[in-house]
């Protein structure tokens, strides 16, 4: 039986993708056909991988393999969230430092993905390596009115971005409907989220 790569090589070197924003299929046109770059949000490494983590990794792996049959170079980047509230909470519970905890579960995650045949991304940047850049971006959002500070939290104001929800084709109200999580009383809008 021929591999996916062998079967794709007999096809014309054109990839059709679904454009969620325009709700239609179209030919994929990379910004740079000599080096196609793909970014995907990776896991928060505080515990073992779950099916949602694996789904994202498998879908991206298939996409990267397809792109590699068409383009000479593909750079795949998937970030690692190695510090956040869940990691800090698990660190306190297990008495393992956040750094050691996230390192442990990143290794387990990468080994788990390898065991199901998923190739590792070319680059896995860690959130802790970009704290200064995140702070600067958040300050810019505060300064332009897209974020606000309340009760020691910084929240993104979803109503400040007129295109919020366009990709999912859901209004802010539709995204809130059926939400089972108690809304923090300090939020201006229940869909606002912590940065």
Regions found by a protein language model. Give the residues of each.
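NTP-dependent nucleotidyl-transfer catalytic core
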Residues: 1-195
């Amino acid at each position: 039986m021929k591999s996916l790569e062998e079967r794709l090589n007999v096809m014309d070197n054109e990839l059709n993708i679904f454009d969620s924003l325009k709700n239609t299929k179209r030919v994929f046109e990379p910004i740079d056909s000599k080096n196609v770059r793909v970014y995907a949000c990776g896991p928060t490494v505080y515990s073992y991988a779950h099916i949602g983590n694996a789904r994202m990794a498998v879908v991206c792996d298939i996409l990267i393999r397809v792109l590699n049959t068409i383009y000479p170079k593909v750079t795949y980047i998937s970030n690692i969230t190695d510090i956040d509230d869940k990691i800090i909470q698990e660190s306190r519970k297990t008495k393992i430092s956040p750094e050691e905890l996230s390192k442990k579960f990143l290794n387990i995650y990468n080994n788990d993905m390898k065991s199901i045949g998923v190739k590792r991304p070319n680059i896995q940047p860690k959130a802790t390596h970009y704290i200064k850049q995140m702070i600067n971006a958040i300050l810019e959002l505060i300064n332009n009115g897209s974020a606000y500070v309340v009760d020691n939290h910084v929240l993104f104001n979803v109503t400040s971005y007129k295109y919020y929800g366009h990709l999912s084709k859901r209004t802010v109200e539709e995204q809130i409907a059926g939400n089972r999580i108690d809304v923090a009383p300090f939020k201006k809008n229940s869909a606002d989220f912590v940065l």
